[in-house]
Amino acid sequence: MVILRHRWHELSISTVSFSFQRALLIAAHEAKLLQFDDATWQRRFGAATERVSLEEQNHLWRTLAEHPRADALVGAFAEHIDPAELGELGYALASCPNLGYAIELLQRYHAFIGDGGSLHLSQNNGLQLDYVPHYQEAQQLRVQTVLICIVA
């Protein structure tokens, strides 16, 4: 049995992976939390960069968390997450033979994808995965989304 839980913590970090931001936007669009026309999509993704400012990421999370149907994001993310949306690490995680190897790899390299946070794996009566986020904006929604990303 794997138990997923989180603890709150704060750390200063300035950028996040563009691929994670893109995956989040796609899930939000699929959940009908955000609607984009073709021109907006082109602006968002036409000039893709490797990293996105944490300020931009925080603004997106605030917008999503304030939506009356914010809970729909977690389900949409689980349904539509594709390893390709998480860049090279996503491909590496998808190629792992089991969840144990994936978590081990993720513990080492997850900061390259998202907005930080620490993953800790411990074993008592079962396995326990602790995710300690390094941010304050929309914590609950972000933690749920990250944990869905890990187990999806």
Listing of model-derived features with the role each one plays in the protein:
Residues 152:
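Oxidoreductase and adenylate-handling cofactor-binding alpha/beta cores
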Residues 1-128, 142, 149:
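N-terminal low-complexity or simple alpha-helical regulatory segments
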Residues 130-141:
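A short interface-forming secondary-structure element
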